[in-house]
Structure formats: structure tokens, C-alpha cells
Amino acid sequence: MAAGGATAAGATVFANRCAVCHGPQAAGIPGSFPSLHEQVVAFAKVPEGRDYLVMVVTTGLMGALKVGGVSYNGVMPAQSGLSEAEIAAVLSYLASDLGRNEAGAPALSAADVSAARARHPDKSAQSTRALRPATES
């Protein structure tokens, strides 16, 4: 898929699945829903971060974490029903800072999503937290 097509597909998945909680610009709501900007871009630049992002979308996420110095302790539901191509598209869209920075992080492919799922077949919303790369916040 061409970069523009991938961005459009990712934007559509984001609008339909993510924006209701994280907001239309992915800024989040402090204390309730984290921003999806800086950390998603940073995570998408490293293999372990890419696996974490794929598994968060696949399994959901439960437990305490900090994003930008703000604490969160909630539940993100698994985004069931998304194809590997849709997961790749939405994560690539987020990793490019909502399509504004194509050089933000490498795009993910459906094959990347499939490989991450194969590496972590037994993850759940609770155990996916352990995949999260260390961050300064």
C-alpha cells in the first residue's frame, strides 16, 4: 500500500477505534486515557516497542503505567476484529504522529503484526504490560 493509502487506512481505523478514548488528535485525557504521541513514536522505532504496540492493540492493556509523568491505572480493551493490515495501518499512522511525520518511525506491515503475535502467543491484557519498553516517565 502506498504511504498515502496507509495513512488514510490508519486514520480511518484510528477514528473508528481509538479516538473515542484518546481523542481525535490522540492527545488523551490526563489521568484517564494517555496521549498516543511521543511514546508511540519512540516505541515504534525499536523492535521490542513494536511488539508491545501490536500486543496492546491485540490483547488490550491492564495495569498501572506512566505516560509523560502522568499516572494511569485503567483498562484498554483488546481491539478484536481488526485484521493484521488494519493493526499495521493504525500503528503506522500513530508512529508517524498522525500522518504529519512520515520519518517519525518505520511503518509496520501486516507481516510485522503477524510476527509479533507469533512471538507472544500467550499474552493477555495483564501480561502485555511486561513488554513495555522502559521510558523516562
Could you say what each language-model-derived stretch is?
Residues 1-15, 28, 32, 42-44:
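Electrostatic cytochrome c docking/interface patches
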Residues 6-10, 49, 53, 86-87, ...:
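Stable alpha-helical elements in mature extracytoplasmic
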Residues 10-24, 76, 90-94:
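The canonical Cys-X-X-Cys-His
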Residues 13, 56, 60, 87-90, ...:
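Hydrophobic aliphatic residue packing
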